[in-house]
Amino acid sequence: MPRSLKKGPFIDAHLFAKVETALETNSRKPIKTWSRRSMILPQMVGLTLSVHNGRTHVPVIVSEQMVGHKLGEFAPTRTYRGHGIDKKAKR
């Protein structure tokens, strides 16, 4: 269920402050964040955010199509190593 329009998008205050300073200083350095729950705003387009996936920080370059989505959607937390081998079919 989407968030109510009258509430507006959620973004952590510390992340928003880092984004604002990066825009003011025109910095190209990645912004490291643990806030996977924050929504991507139009001001973030073009920035590089390092989103934590539980083990490492995954670099995410924000584009126009990502606006309105959450940061966690672009940093997968699970690694898929394939299904197990069927030993009966191998014979």
From Swiss-Prot:
GO BP term, example: translation
Native source organism of the sequence: Psychrobacter arcticus (strain DSM 17307 / VKM B-2377 / 273-4)
Protein name: Small ribosomal subunit protein uS19
Record carries keyword Phosphoprotein: no
Keyword Ribonucleoprotein in record: yes
Name of a matching Pfam family: Ribosomal_S19
Superkingdom, taxonomy of origin: Bacteria
InterPro entries (UniProt xref): Ribosomal_uS19, Ribosomal_uS19_bac-type, Ribosomal_uS19_CS, Ribosomal_uS19_SF
